[in-house]
């Protein structure tokens, strides 16, 4: 089995592509006619599986597809062979490739080899600490670069798919999600619940699953070769190991490196320890952040400026909450992520009288800082010169080159980390100076544009505006752009669209003059397998039902009938969708017509909407103790505890004078002071997926049956992206 193919330079394009794809995504050359691509012979992909009575690990040498498997269990002890193998990897300067191997697989493997662990239960306990332990416990178990037996390349870190946010519920992107994104034939999850004591037959099955995961990781590895090469080159250039850095972290480190060369100090020595330099502010006067040349003629924009200038804040969160300006019927929303405004459910078309024009600020936030000498206070004004040097270094590399991309990340790291409590760039006043002025300066351009007779604003976003301009005033708008550039010392880049199809600010299609489409939000459908440089559907994004935006595009751009397009669409994978449930939840397939009979599914599955399936349901545990009253909002812990104690001690057996329906599972009566007004109780929560439609699990692609696809669902969803735009008069 080979994993990387290369097109013939004569009959094809000569480029590399993953061998699991049927055709070259660049030129369409069939895979069977291509040659094997070159893979670094140092790279060995591996993955471990751990249960209370068994440990398995699978290695595959990617370049040759040579495979090894090892087991430590009550029936078999491969520890001596595993130790020898790992030491051979060390001796030949091998590199271990994995998915979350730095955070999990390697720390377990390292301790097994170094401590000669042959007790599967002890190995399992170690693994559980890495999965469920506290931050301190996990940190203590990490193995740093200098101590590793062989180098590690972790793809989850390269792509920054390990990010999580407990507040928003964002979880790391799992390997299973990537299997769906890469369109693997068989998407598999752990075959047995964590903690199960496995039989011999189950252990044999575990080995097969272990190999499946390694192959899936290799598939993702060959799709990551450009990112890996960039990190290897930058590591050599800067003398620092960037191999497992995300783009953001890599950019921050490059910026620090370049500025330190210019004499900028990012760290102090305190008690012989290196301590980050930061600017921590108890409060920020926003009036001091706004540039003195920000002035408005329109009272709506001036009211926003005046309100912001009058504020002194103690935290940046919520500064712009509810802040907007309605100007000539278009609402401009201000936020920490930038300004946003857009017409909705409209189609615009350039014609003999009007032209759609889009202007964006080149490297907006970096140049805003450079031209206005903005910097974190602790870094000093000298930082501005060094930062500008990084900008010019980026400009020296061609667009699309790895170096250009790396220095772009370095430039973005300044603002991106300025509100990060763990960063050497921390200064929230700098953060607010950038985001406040960025939005207000764009509004200054907007208010001059809307004076022009017949000009209509279409959109405003973080770094630019789009407008529908009478052709006789195009040169006048360019003069206004030149005036704005001279005022701000920034540069605007113009693009012209022939048509725009707009659902809202987050979802639209823009057709460039001369061809080419810009697809945003609900209309995006280009996958990274089709174009590695796309930002439409990256590997970490849910690729569900791509036939829907494709049909909408065909209808809007080409006038194709939606149902005709969908029923004749040849790519079966475009009908497939992804369902995902957190590990604490259950995902079940239920059949209401059979007394709600149900079967448990994996926590992430692939499915399609069918005429013959069941109902897909997520089942979540209660957010509190089952059957107890839900706590009202804004009730302090002290108040809640005091009232609860009062209710508990005042109860009479069995329920005092309260009606049985007014007490919860613990016998606590409902009290308006601390409980929700609607007397809701904590219970099992159910959320339907594709409610009202039947679905069929096709995690194994063999279960996809085109004859059972319910085209009505896909047609209906595509119509939601098309019909609202057609009911509004077009321009």
Across the structure, where does each feature detected by a protein language model lie?
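Helical catalytic core of nucleic-acid polymerases
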Residues: 156, 169-171, 190-196, 324-447, ...
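The −1 position to Zn-ligating cysteines in a subset of zinc-ribbon hairpins
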Residues: 6, 12, 23, 178
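Short Cys/His-rich micro-motifs in 6-15 aa windows
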Residues: 4-5, 28-36
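Conserved DEDDh/DEDDy metal-dependent 3′-5′ exonuclease domain
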Residues: 67-176
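Cysteine-rich micro-motifs
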Residues: 20-30
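C-terminal, non-catalytic extensions of nucleic-acid polymerases
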Residues: 324, 474-731
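Conserved "right-hand" nucleotidyltransferase catalytic core of DNA-directed polymerases
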Residues: 3, 164-165, 169-170, 181-189, ...
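Cys/His-coordinated zinc-binding microdomains
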Residues: 8-17, 28
């Amino acid at each position: 089995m080979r994993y990387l193919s290369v097109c013939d330079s004569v009959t094809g394009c000569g480029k590399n592509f993953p061998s699991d794809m049927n055709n070259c995504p660049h030129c369409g050359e069939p895979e069977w006619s291509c040659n094997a691509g070159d893979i670094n012979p140092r790279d060995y992909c591996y993955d471990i599986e751990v249960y209370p009575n068994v440990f398995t690990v699978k290695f595959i040498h990617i370049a040759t597809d040579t495979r090894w498997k090892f087991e430590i269990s009550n029936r078999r002890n491969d520890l001596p062979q595993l130790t020898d193998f790992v030491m051979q990897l060390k001796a030949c300067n091998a590199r271990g490739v994995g998915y979350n191997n730095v955070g999990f697989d390697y720390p377990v493997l390292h301790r097994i080899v170094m401590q000669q662990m042959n007790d599967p239960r002890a190995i399992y306990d170690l693994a559980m600490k890495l999965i469920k332990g506290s931050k301190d416990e996990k940190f203590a178990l990490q193995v740093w670069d200098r101590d590793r037996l062989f180098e590690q390349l972790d793809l989850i870190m390269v792509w920054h798919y390990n990010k999580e946010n407990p507040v928003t519920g964002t979880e790391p992107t799992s390997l299973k999600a990537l299997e769906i994104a890469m369109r693997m034939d068989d998407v598999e999850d752990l075959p047995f619940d964590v903690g199960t004591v496995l039989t011999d037959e189950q252990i044999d099955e575990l080995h097969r699953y272990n190999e499946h995961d390694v192959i899936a990781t290799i598939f993702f590895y060959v799709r990551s070769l450009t990112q890996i090469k960039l990190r290897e080159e930058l590591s050599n250039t800067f003398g620092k190991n960037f191999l497992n850095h995300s783009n953001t972290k890599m950019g921050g480190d490059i910026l620090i490196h370049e500025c330190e060369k210019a004499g900028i100090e990012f760290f102090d020595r305190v008690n012989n320890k290196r301590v980050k330099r930061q600017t921590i502010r108890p409060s920020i006067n926003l009036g001091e952040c706004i540039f003195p040349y920000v002035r408005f003629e329109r009272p709506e924009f001036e009211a926003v400026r005046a309100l912001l200038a009058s504020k002194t804040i103690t935290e940046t969160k919520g500064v712009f909450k509810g802040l907007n300006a309605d100007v000539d019927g278009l609402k401009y929303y201000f936020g920490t992520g930038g300004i946003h405004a857009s017409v909705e459910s409209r189609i615009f078309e350039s014609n003999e009288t009007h032209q759609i024009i889009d202007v964006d600020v080149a490297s907006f936030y970096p140049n805003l800082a450079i031209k206005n000498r903005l910097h974190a206070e602790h870094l000093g004004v000298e930082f501005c010169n060094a930062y500008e040097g990084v900008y010019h270094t980026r400009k020296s590399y061609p667009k699309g080159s790895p170096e250009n991309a790396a220095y772009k990340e370095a430039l973005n790291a300044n603002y991106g980390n300025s509100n990060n409590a763990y960063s050497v760039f921390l200064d929230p006043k700098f953060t607010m100076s950038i985001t406040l002025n960025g939005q207000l300066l764009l509004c200054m351009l907007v208010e001059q544009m809307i004076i022009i007779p017949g000009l209509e604003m279409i959109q405003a976003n973080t770094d630019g505006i789009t407008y529908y301009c009478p052709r006789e005033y195009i040169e006048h708008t360019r003069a206004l752009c030149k005036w704005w550039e001279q005022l701000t010392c920034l540069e605007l880049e113009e693009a012209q669209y022939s048509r725009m199809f707009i659902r809202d600010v987050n979802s639209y299609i823009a057709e460039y003059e001369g061809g080419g489409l810009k697809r945003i939000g609900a209309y995006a459908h280009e996958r990274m397998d089709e174009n590695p440089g796309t930002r439409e559907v990256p590997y970490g994004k849910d690729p569900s039902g791509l036939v829907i935006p494709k049909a909408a595009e065909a209808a809007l751009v080409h006038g194709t009938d939606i149902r005709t397009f969908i029923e004749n669409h040849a790519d079966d994978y475009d009908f497939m969708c992804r369902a995902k449930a957190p590990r604490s939840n259950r995902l079940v397939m239920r059949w209401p017509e059979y007394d709600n009979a149900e079967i448990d599914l994996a926590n992430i599955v692939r499915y399609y909407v069918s005429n013959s399936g069941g109902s897909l349901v997520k089942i979540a545990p209660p957010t509190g103790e089952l059957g107890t009253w839900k706590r009202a909002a804004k009730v302090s812990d002290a108040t809640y505890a005091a009232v609860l104690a009062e209710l508990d001690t005042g109860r009479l057996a069995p329920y005092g004078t309260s009606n049985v329906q007014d007490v919860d599972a613990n016998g606590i009566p409902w009290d308006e002071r601390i409980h929700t007004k609607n007397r809701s109780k904590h219970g099992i929560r159910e959320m339907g997926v594709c409610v009202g439609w039947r679905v069929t699990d096709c995690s194994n692609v063999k279960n996809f049956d085109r004859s059972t696809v319910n085209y009505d669902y896909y047609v209906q969803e595509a119509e939601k992206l098309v019909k609202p735009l057609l009911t509004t008069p077009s321009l």
